[in-house]
Each structure stands twice: as C-alpha cells, then as structure tokens.
Curated annotation (Swiss-Prot):
Swiss-Prot/TrEMBL domain comment: The EIIB domain is phosphorylated by phospho-EIIA on a cysteinyl or histidyl residue, depending on the transported sugar. Then, it transfers the phosphoryl group to the sugar substrate concomitantly with the sugar uptake processed by the EIIC domain. The EIIC domain forms the PTS system translocation channel and contains the specific substrate-binding site.
Topological type in the membrane: Multi-pass membrane protein
Protein name: PTS system N-acetylmuramic acid-specific EIIBC component
Stretches in topological domain Cytoplasmic: 1-123, 179-180, 239-260, 323-334, 390-393, 462-474
Organism: Shigella dysenteriae serotype 1 (strain Sd197)
Amino acid sequence: MAKEISSELLNTILTRVGGPGNIASCGNCMTRLRLGVHDSSLVDPNIKTLEGVKGVILTSDQVQVVFGPGKAHRATKAMSELLGEAPVQDAAEIAAQNKRQLKAKQTSGVQQFLAKFATIFTPLIPGFIAAGLLLGIATLIATVMHVPADAQGTLPDALNFMKVFSKGLFTFLVILVGYNAAQAFGGTGVNGAIIAALFLLGYNPAATTGYYAGFHDFFGLPIDPRGNIIGVLIAAWACARIEGMVRRFMPDDLDMLLTSLITLLITATLAYLIIMPLGGWLFEGMSWLFMHLNSNPLGCAVLAGLFLIAVVFGVHQGFIPVYLALMDSQGFNSLFPILSMAGAGQVGAALALYWRAQPHSGLRSQVRGAIIPGLLGVGEPLIYGVTLPRMKPFITACLGGAAGGLFIGLIAWWGLPMGLNSAFGPSGLVALPLMTSAQGILPAMAIYAGGILVAWVCGFIFTTLFGCRNVNLD
C-alpha cells in the first residue's frame, strides 16, 4: 500500500473522527474517502494537516478526506477492514449516537439528498470514462482516416468493437442506476433494477426494434415510458420506501417469498400510472432549462464560475442526473465541458502563483506537485493545497473558469454546440478525444481546447492582477 494511505495514517484519521464508534458509514467517490459520522462535534478538523491528506470537507454528518484518484478506493477498503476489527458498542451508546445522528440529519437535508447521488453514480464512473474514451478514440480514428460508417475490413471491425461498449452501457444504463438507487435509498437492488427495466421495454406491438412488453396499455390506460433516468430515480426511491413498509408488517417466515413480490406489484402500478408521466415532465423541464443555459453565454459563465464551489462543498455529484438527461435529449453532454472550465481556470491561477512565488518557496513545491493532476482534470490537489487556503486565488480561479465557460457558450450561441460523448468522463486535457458535436469530433475538440486555453490565460491574468495581493506566497 502506498505511503499516503498507510495503516498508521488511517488509524490516525479514525482516531481524529471520534473513533470506530462514531462511524456510521464508510464509502468513497473518485477522489475522497467519505465517512458518515454520528456526532460531528467529535471530529478534529486538523485532519487536513496530516501528510498524505490533500484536503478535508466537513458537513454535519460526514467527513470527506481527499486522497486522489485510485488512492481513495484503497483507503476506503483499508478503512473498512479497520472498522471490521473495531469493538462492538453497547446498546446505550448506540442509542445515544443514533439520537445525535437524527438531529444532525435535520439540518443537512440538502447535503444528505445530494450525497445519495454519489452513492448511486460513483460506482458507474469508471465505466463511463472507459466507454467514453474508447468511443472517442474510435471516432477520432474514423474521422482522421476517413473510414465510412458501412466500411468492411479489419480496421472498421476494430472501430466498431471499440464503440460497442458505449452502446451497451447507455442501452442498459437505467438498470444499473435502478439497482444502485434502490440500495442507496435502503431497498433491495434487484427490485430497483426490475422496476428500471420497465422503462426500457417497448409498449408498441408494431415496433420493429426494442423488447416488446407483451401489452400496450395498463388496464386500458396508455403507457408512456418517458423520463428515463429521472423517472427511474423516482421509481427506485418509491420502491425502497414501499419495500420498507411491506417488510415492517411481513412475518419473517414469509419475508423472502412475499416482500419483493408485493413491492414490485405496487411500485410497477405507481410507475405506469404516475411516475412515468411525472418523470417525463421533469425530464423535459430539466433538459429545457440546461439546454437553454448551455446556449446562453452568460449562463455558461455562471455555471463554470460556480462549479469549484460545488466541488468544495462536495455537492458536484448532484449534476450527474442532469448529464444523463442531456445525453438523452441531445445525444451528448453539453454541460460537462462547460463545468470542466472551472478546473482549467484553477490551473491558470496556480501558474500565476508559481510565477509570483519565490524560487525556493513551499508554494512552488505545492504547485509543482499538483499542476500535472490539474492539467489532467484532477483538481482537488490544487483546490485544497494551493488556491482555497489563500482564498483570493480561489476566487480568481473561479473567474478564469467563468471566462472559459463564456467562450464555449458563445460558440454554442453562434451555432456550434458541443459536448462530451458520455454522461461522465475525465476533464482537463484527457477529455479532448471525448468531445463530439453535430459537425464531428475535430470541431468539438478545437472548441474545448479553445475554452481550456481561455480559462488558463484568464485565470493566470486575474490571479496575477488581483489574486496575489496580501496573499501568502511562501
């Protein structure tokens, strides 16, 4: 195991969050170890000073420790092993902690809600990235080498093979989301997956594609399986709640036989009658809102300028349902490259700080260690190690990101919208081959590269002019 996530470090973190008895849950996203806590008053905020920890975000019931990509997963696995060896609490202590946890939840409802999205979508992100990269590379090769869509031979076969993963992922994505969502909301994953599959089935007997459900109406009422991800999330939440209510009254001997059966019947009825139409309306409204924001240069600037703040508070995972809605409505994720400009603005700010710092200062060492991950789309080392502790550079980094978002918004406003070819992917320079547009991959790559360049330059200029005054540059 790497030094940064040694057992000594994890034991220290465990002690500083109040010990094993204060841990309610242990999980991770791409870059953070997420520890749910019963009592936040027991948490020592100086965890962020530990060597190997790149930052800490504290909420009323969760501690997010920033390690970085890959390391967060290893840290979570090791921490889970440590927690598994922890002594069992007595009933009185558990009751007292549950009371404190309930009180904390009353003041953090929004963060609790958004944290669910991390639980649902974080396990899917590596697949999004892999499938998106393969699709982007295949599309780039086909464009550069002028390979027709109906071409035959080894190269076309290889390109089709690279593209098939993206098709498979997005064809059956709702089933994966339904499974994870049902679990996140406290239900059984397979029940959520089965309910999600109802949104995939076809209800038109004359259709020549898809999977026919076997009926075209629900007891005489029309079926309109719209809403996709939004509807599936609502249905999975309802499924978990209904399962909990059914299990509360179900005798233990009949639980395995009847609980899921009754849950599926009730949830499917609600899905056909209420959730599918409701999800469709919400889906259309959300798509309309963000499509209009994406085509509005000022809206793009605001979104890009505020995204770093969302990352700091750990609520950026809340955008993932929007990404999926845009994929369904546009065929690409036009919001993601706009938000990616936030990280590019931070790179420009960090370079300005490096330029203004003394040759052998600690700040220069910090920037050198964090700039490469920043260029590749991993922004936490720059946020928590360089810009946020000095505040002014963090603000100018946000302004640099806003300038990049404004650039992409202007290009879209002039008639060339572009976006990511996947619901989620890497940002920074790594995302270049994942860009796509109605005019092809090369114009999309050029626009994205232009936005990054604008954000770099503006972040550098804003920080040089306004972000270094009365700021510690040592």
